[in-house]
Amino acid sequence: MAKKIEAYIKLQVAAGQANPSPPVGPALGQRGVNIMEFCKAFNAKTQGMEPGLPIPTVITVYSDRSFTFITKTPPAPVLLKKAAGIKSGSGRPNTDKVGTVTRAQLEEIAKTKEPDLTAADMEAAVRTIAGTARSMGLNVEGL
């Protein structure tokens, strides 16, 4: 018989840097999950990724206090900021442009994000990422 699901917990945790401090500790502690067990498993799974990159994670907590978790790809704005070499997006994206990204950079980000995007093909995925870039105040070259 399948285990009864008690809760889903959605967190963004830095790759390879999960520790019992907030936000991880309180979110898991409320549900009675072994926090250190999650931290060790998460850090082991994200070992090959760039340290500090925020990773969206969905943790499924079962009634017997066990858990499973799924890691997703880093958020597109984080990848775009890294590609453009900027700290943050524009406060007024239509008037103040803060950087530029090329089509090659957009394709690279779209390939990284492909498992989490609902785009029909790679061209649609690139256009989706380009829209995110424009909404952050980045110029898009090559589209």
Swiss-Prot record:
Protein source organism: Marinobacter nauticus (strain ATCC 700491 / DSM 11845 / VT8)
Function: Forms part of the ribosomal stalk which helps the ribosome interact with GTP-bound translation factors.
Protein's UniProt keywords contain Transferase: no
GO BP field: translation
Domain of life: Bacteria
Keywords assigned by UniProt, alphabetized: Methylation, Ribonucleoprotein, Ribosomal protein, RNA-binding, rRNA-binding
SMART domains: RL11
Family: Belongs to the universal ribosomal protein uL11 family.
Post-translational modifications reported in the UniProt record: One or more lysine residues are methylated.
Protein's name in the database: Large ribosomal subunit protein uL11
SS bonds (residue pairs): none
GO cellular component: cytosolic large ribosomal subunit
